[in-house]
Swiss-Prot record:
The name this protein goes by in its record: Innexin inx2
Organism field: Schistocerca americana (American grasshopper)
Free-text function comment from the UniProt entry: Structural components of the gap junctions.
Gene Ontology CC entries for this record: gap junction; plasma membrane
Homology family: Belongs to the pannexin family.
Gene transcribed to yield this protein: inx2
Expression (tissue specificity): Widespread expression in embryo, in anterior and posterior row of neural precursors, midline precursors and in epithelial sheet of stomodeum.
MF annotations from Gene Ontology: gap junction channel activity
Length: 359
């Protein structure tokens, strides 16, 4: 089992230079790891174990298993609440009249592992776009200043290069910042879109699935209907047709056990809560980003928080002279440069922008 998750270890590696933020990393690191781990877990049980076992008289078990795996199994929604052993064999499994009773096919069953992996790819796309657009700019600008132990001459030279870079490229870096903001918006569109994608995949059951499970746990035992048994039944029906000795069509009703649904029901409960929380946090992050894009005062407060060692007047000078792109690059550098060196960089940059000589 540990080998199954071994391929996920590479995603846990931390980057030496930070080019985004914690919320962004929840999308392309935490969520991608979760989805790939779940996909591997389902795959290991699906293709190493036995994903379906069907029972029916007169039909070889291997044939029935293969047939029901390909053509999907079903339950009868109006048999979900019958008494097990008396009215129904299992929740949703009972006698039904073809054409009269509604049947619900569970076509998602064999596709769960592929869909989870596809979702992981979608969550990585905004990160891939930003990494491509960013082009290693922050890594190039850091120039080993993320270490507190730097030769004084090298430190002075690299600080001068940074100050000259900002002075030369002043007011030309807005597009760089806007591309990051676009990727943040894509994160939000992606997570909300995936909630509705999973709802479509599970035949309209996902958007209320988590809240239904919570409501189920709070209800009295005799009044409640298990939503997990409705969406992810462990026992289903499968109808097999074949020709009899006289050439007439014979119909056989079989019972199928779906062991993977024991895992699937837990996976999708977790994903419901994770996606809802992630979409709320990302929405709040977009409001925060809008505030920074529209409010110079907000940017000044954030820069002051990032460079607490720098005097107030230097922060105000930089905030007044810089546009959002310049502020964003400087703010990102603050995440990667040693605080003492960053304080000196802010001081030198403030002097440069004021037209003073840097000593």
């Amino acid at each position: 089992m540990f080998d199954v998750f071994g391929s996920v270890k590479g995603l846990l590696k931390l980057d030496s230079v930070c080019i985004d933020n914690n919320l962004f990393r929840l999308h392309y690191k935490a969520t991608v790891i979760i989805l790939i781990a779940f996909s591997l877990l389902v795959t290991s049980r699906q293709y190493i174990g036995d994903p379906i076992d069907c029972i029916v008289d007169e039909i070889p078990l291997a044939v029935m298993d293969t047939y029901c795996w390909i053509y999907s199994t079903f339950t009868i929604p109006n048999r979900l609440n019958g008494k097990i052993g008396l009215e129904v064999a299992h929740p949703g499994v009972g006698a039904h009249v073809a054409g009269k009773d509604e049947v619900k096919y569970h076509k998602y069953y064999q596709w769960v592992c592929f869909v989870l992996f596809f979702q992981a790819i979608l969550f990585y796309i905004p990160r891939y776009l930003w990494k491509t657009w960013e082009g290693g700019r922050i890594k190039m600008l850091v120039l080993d200043l993320n270490s507190p132990v730097v030769n004084e001459q090298s430190k002075a030279d690299r600080k001068k290069l940074l100050v000259d870079y900002f002075a030369t490229n002043l007011h030309t870096q807005n597009f760089y910042a806007y591309r990051f903001f676009i990727c943040e918006a894509l994160n939000f569109v992606n997570v909300v879109g995936q909630i509705y994608f999973m709802d479509l995949f599970l035949d309209g059951e996902f958007t209320t699935y988590g809240s239904d499970v919570v409501r189920f746990t709070e209800m009295e035992p005799e009044e409640r209907s298990d939503p997990m048994s409705r969406v992810f039944p462990k026992v289903t029906k499968c109808t097999f047709h074949k020709y009899g000795p006289s050439g007439s069509v014979q119909t056989f009703d079989g019972l199928c056990v779906l062991p993977l649904n024991i895992v699937n029901e837990k996976i999708y409960v977790f994903l419901w809560f994770w996606f809802v929380i992630l979409s709320v946090l990302t929405g709040i992050g977009l409001v925060y980003r809008l505030a920074t894009a529209m409010g110079p005062q907000m940017r000044m407060y954030l820069l002051r928080a990032r460079s607490r060692l720098a005097p107030q007047d230097q922060i105000e000078t930089i905030s007044n002279k810089c546009q959002i792109g310049d502020w964003f690059v400087l703010y990102q550098l603050g995440k990667n440069i040693d605080p003492l060196i960053y304080k000196e960089l802010v001081a030198d940059l403030a002097k440069k922008l004021e037209g003073k000589e840097i000593v």
